[in-house]
Design a protein with these regions (language model features):
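Alpha-helical transmembrane segments of multi-pass membrane proteins
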Residues: 54-61, 116-124, 155-156, 175-186
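Topogenic membrane-insertion module of multi-pass membrane proteins
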Residues: 1-62, 186
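C-terminal ends of transmembrane helices
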Residues: 64-75, 122-136, 141, 181-192
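Helix-coil boundary and interhelical linker segments in multi-pass alpha-helical membrane proteins
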Residues: 37-52, 88, 92-112, 154-171
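N-terminal TM1-TM2 helical hairpin plus the immediately adjacent luminal interfacial "cap"
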Residues: 40-46, 62-79
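C-terminal membrane-associated helical module and adjoining short loops/tails
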Residues: 1-12, 136-193
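Multi-pass membrane catalytic core of lipid/isoprenoid biosynthesis enzymes
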Residues: 19-29, 70-128
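Active-site His/Glu-centered metal-binding helix of metallohydrolases
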Residues: 33, 59, 63, 67, ...
Length: 193
């Protein structure tokens, strides 16, 4: 005799409005918009605006997870979507900003270090997504939003003081390489979740 699926009585179904599941993903989408804006601004030479957009993306990234936990709407879809957006916002956008601003003059070496930063961001995210953390209080490796904010803050600060990207080339190269290494290192970093 075939086994029948158990039917859940209507009164036991989740009564939350379906729209509440959209709320955390709206923050994630806003983070993606900020990353896209950062990329566009960097391609037209507005590096200060691009840097600020990456910082805005980081703030929105902090909020999407908190909103999902507060509203009890965390989902596998949301986790995957957040990770894809993180790669764009904290890997591609800051790498392109720094490349356009100061690494372009290095030719192949410039785009190789920028690509290495994007690749280590992807590796950091993949490790975070697949590895059970022994401690909720610490991350293994520098979180990619922190690395991106440090790069963006360096560009924004330099731009504010009139420092051009070409005079920041070596410092930018070293900073990007150090942050790329820190993301994939085994060093513990405190979590503020």
């Amino acid at each position: 005799m075939p086994k029948l699926n158990k039917v859940t009585p209507f009164e036991q179904h989740d009564k939350r409005p379906k729209g509440i599941y959209i709320l955390p993903n709206l923050f994630t989408t806003a983070s993606l918009f900020a990353a896209f804006y950062a990329i566009v601004q960097s391609t037209v030479g507005n590096f200060g605006n691009a840097a600020i957009a990456v910082i805005v993306a980081a703030v929105l990234d902090m909020l999407d997870g908190r909103v999902a936990r507060m509203t009890n709407t965390a989902s596998d879809f949301g986790k995957e979507y957040d990770s894809l957006v993180d790669l764009v916002a904290f890997g591609l956008a800051p790498a392109l900003i720094l490349f356009e601003w100061g690494l372009q003059s290095l030719g192949k070496a410039g785009w190789l270090i920028a690509f290495a930063y994007v690749a280590t961001t992807a590796l950091r995210l993949a490790r975070f997504n697949t590895q059970d953390s022994p401690s909720k209080r610490y991350f293994q490796g520098l979180p990619c939003p922190a690395a991106a904010v440090l790069l963006a803050a360096a560009v924004w600060t330099a731009e504010s003081y009139g420092v051009t990207g070409t005079s920041f080339t070596v410092a930018g190269l070293v900073l990007m390489a150090l942050l790329a290494f820190a993301m994939v290192s085994a060093m513990p970093y405190r979590s503020f979740k």
